[in-house]
Regions:
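Intrinsically disordered, low-complexity, mixed-charge
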Residues: 1-91
Length: 91
C-alpha cells in the first residue's frame, strides 16, 4: 500500500510573470499528484498536493526552486490528513 501524503503549501517571493501556477500544475500532473494550485491576491502561490510521499515532495521541490525567473523568498509546508483528491486543477 502506498504512503499517501497531503501538504498545504504557500510560496512567497518575486513570482509575478513566471508562470509559477502552470509550472506547479504541470509537475503535479507529471508526478501523478492530485490537488490544486492558485495565485493569491497578495502574489503568493497556494497549493494543496496529495499523493505518494516521494512524488508530492518532488512537486514541493519545484515550489522551493521555482520556475525560471522566479525568486522564491519562502515556502511554508503544512501536512494535512489525505482527503482522496481525484484530480489536479488550477483554481
Amino acid at each position: 500500500m502506498e504512503d499517501k501524503t497531503r501538504v498545504h503549501v504557500f510560496v512567497s517571493g518575486d513570482l509575478d510573470g513566471t508562470h509559477f501556477v502552470n509550472s506547479v500544475a504541470e509537475k503535479a500532473t507529471e508526478q501523478g499528484v492530485t490537488g490544486w494550485v492558485k495565485e493569491l491576491s497578495d502574489g503568493r502561490i497556494e497549493a494543496v498536493l496529495e499523493g505518494p510521499r516521494d512524488e508530492v515532495y518532488r512537486v514541493v521541490g519545484l515550489c522551493r526552486a521555482g520556475p525560471n525567473g522566479a525568486r522564491v523568498a519562502g515556502v511554508q509546508v503544512d501536512r494535512e490528513p489525505p482527503r482522496n483528491e481525484k484530480t489536479f486543477k488550477v483554481k
